[in-house]
UniProtKB/Swiss-Prot annotation:
It comes from the Bacteria. The keyword Membrane does not apply. This is Small ribosomal subunit protein uS15. One of the primary rRNA binding proteins, it binds directly to 16S rRNA where it helps nucleate assembly of the platform of the 30S subunit by binding and bridging several RNA helices of the 16S rRNA. Signal peptide: none annotated. One of its GO terms (cellular component) is cytosolic small ribosomal subunit. InterPro entries: Ribosomal_uS15 (IPR000589), Ribosomal_uS15_bac-type (IPR005290), uS15_NS1_RNA-bd_sf (IPR009068). One of its GO terms (biological process) is translation. The gene is rpsO. Keywords: Ribonucleoprotein, Ribosomal protein, RNA-binding, rRNA-binding. The lineage of its organism: Bacteria, Pseudomonadati, Aquificota, Aquificia, Aquificales. Disulfide bonds: none annotated. Belongs to the universal ribosomal protein uS15 family.
Length: 95
């Protein structure tokens, strides 16, 4: 369900803006996306796990807010991250 420390470090290294970057929107979005994908697989196998489903909804909302922020601040960085992570652009993100 959760991601390994190695996978998290790999994502941080790939999306970091500089060497010690762990908190930029790109890194946070990448880590959240990996957690969302893992939790989605868990929920597919455990349909009655409502507590995990609620956590998933919270993660998706947090990622959407970060994507909205990134789109407001830098359209280029926003486009790059959604293409790299293969995330759909929804109409809610433009509001």
């Amino acid at each position: 369900m959760s991601i390994t420390a190695e996978k998290k470090q790999e994502l941080i290294k790939k999306f970091a803006l500089h060497e010690n970057d762990t908190g930029s929107p790109e890194v946070q979005i990448a880590v959240l996306t990996e957690r969302i994908r893992n939790l989605t697989e868990h929920i597919k196998a455990n349909k009655k796990d409502l507590h995990s489903r609620r956590g998933l909804i919270g993660m998706v909302n947090k990622r959407r807010k970060l994507l909205n922020y990134l789109k407001r601040e830098s359209e280029e960085r926003y486009r790059k991250i959604i293409e790299a992570l293969n995330i759909r652009e929804t109409s809610n993100e433009s509001k």
